[in-house]
Amino acid sequence: MMPLLHAARMLVLMALGACSAEKHAFDRHLAQLRPDTVTALPDMGWPAGTMLCPLSLYQSALAGSAPLAGRVNAFLKKKQFLGGEDWSLIVVRPLPAGEAGIEQLFFKRADYDVLNDPQRIGRDAEKVPTGFAPQTCVSVEQARVLVTREQRAHRKLIIFGTALT
């Protein structure tokens, strides 16, 4: 009986381990993108009017001039978020108002980095095509991601923004 119970526990632990290693669908989508492309985001079920605000590595707040900066930064401050080795996506739904409409998704650093600082984009990105405008926060309806390469390290860079069609 004990070996059977031990085997059952091991199966449960292995299943839990497999679930925790599972990437979010959004992360899987970004990881599959090829450099030198601008693409729309997949439908993640976010309602119209939802804003997406990526935070890059070690970034703990949005720039003060960014749309929604006050609301998002108050949310991050209340959570005592300090940034770190991972990047995150702040999802701000139009309703409900306040903190209840904000969600923070965390993504482990992988084979790409997310940038949203204009100075870093200008310094590190190999190229930003004409017609693509990097944005600190972007609506799901207009959101596009640019995939480019870092000039010195050749890592993929993901930049959120809008594109002229």
Question: Which residue ranges define each predicted feature?
Answer:
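Short, surface-exposed beta-strand/loop "edge" segments at domain boundaries and coil↔beta transitions
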Residues: 61-62, 97-103, 155, 164-165
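Mid-length scaffold segments of soluble, non-membrane domains
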Residues: 79-105
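Long, charged/polar, surface-exposed segments that mediate recognition or autoinhibition
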Residues: 97-121
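C-terminal partner/receptor-binding element of secreted or periplasmic proteins
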Residues: 114-165
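Sec-dependent bacterial lipoprotein signal peptides
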Residues: 1-17
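Surface-exposed acidic loop/strand-edge motifs in secreted or periplasmic proteins
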Residues: 57-89
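N-terminal export/targeting and maturation segments
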Residues: 19-70
